[in-house]
């Protein structure tokens, strides 16, 4: 599903954000119908990075109760200043171990777990905070050097070691398809993702995420 930025002029009201969300959900439903998939199995995660507090508050009023951020310290500031909203914050970007302490304090979900060093750093900080964290293992199914994530062949060994980190609740895999009009290259990545998915650990649940970004 292709969503160009030009398709989504910046919304200026709760009503406009709600209308944008409805349009995206309709497109998701249509795509699911073509694929023979239940739309309820797809979760839309609006991304609020660089979006100011006023517009985020409008987005929440329009029904966005889970938001994605890839700049950890910016996300923590937002979580603290908007604690009254009850937003579930999902960290979607690559994480350095020295930023694990921030994620452990506020995030409900981390979608880019790709090393045991990060798993250990999160485990230690979550113990101090007495919290748990939902995580997705990031897999580089497109084989692009510019992207983070495990190679599909490394997933099985990696996930077998994750039960040692009991503060991490493994929910599934996260991957980004290659951005190209060449359909077969995209499908090849999908096949690699399917192979990697068969390696998830016993305590994990399958997680399916549609990455689409309506502008808040």
Please provide the spans of the model-predicted regions:
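Conserved alpha/beta-domain cores
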Residues: 1-215
């Amino acid at each position: 599903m292709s969503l160009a930025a030009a398709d989504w002029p910046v919304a200026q009201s709760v009503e406009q954000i709600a209308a944008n969300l409805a349009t995206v959900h309709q497109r998701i439903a249509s795509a699911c119908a073509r694929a023979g998939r239940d739309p309820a199995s797809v979760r839309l995660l609006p991304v609020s990075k660089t979006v100011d507090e006023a517009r985020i508050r409008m987005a929440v009023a329009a029904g966005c109760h889970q938001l994605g951020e890839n700049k950890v310290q910016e996300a923590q500031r937002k979580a603290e200043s908007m604690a009254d909203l009850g937003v579930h914050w999902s960290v979607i970007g690559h994480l350095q171990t020295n930023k694990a302490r921030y994620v452990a304090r506020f995030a409900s979900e981390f979608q880019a777990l790709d090393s045991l060093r990060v798993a250990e750093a999160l485990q230690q900080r979550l113990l101090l905070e007495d919290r748990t964290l939902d995580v997705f293992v990031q897999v580089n199914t497109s084989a692009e050097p510019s992207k983070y994530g495990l190679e599909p062949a490394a997933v099985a060994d990696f996930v077998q070691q994750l039960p040692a980190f009991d503060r991490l609740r493994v929910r599934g895999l996260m991957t980004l398809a290659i951005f190209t009009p060449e359909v077969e290259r995209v499908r090849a990545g999908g096949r690699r993702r399917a192979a990697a998915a068969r390696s998830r650990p016993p305590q994990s649940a399958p997680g399916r995420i549609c990455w689409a970004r309506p502008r808040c």
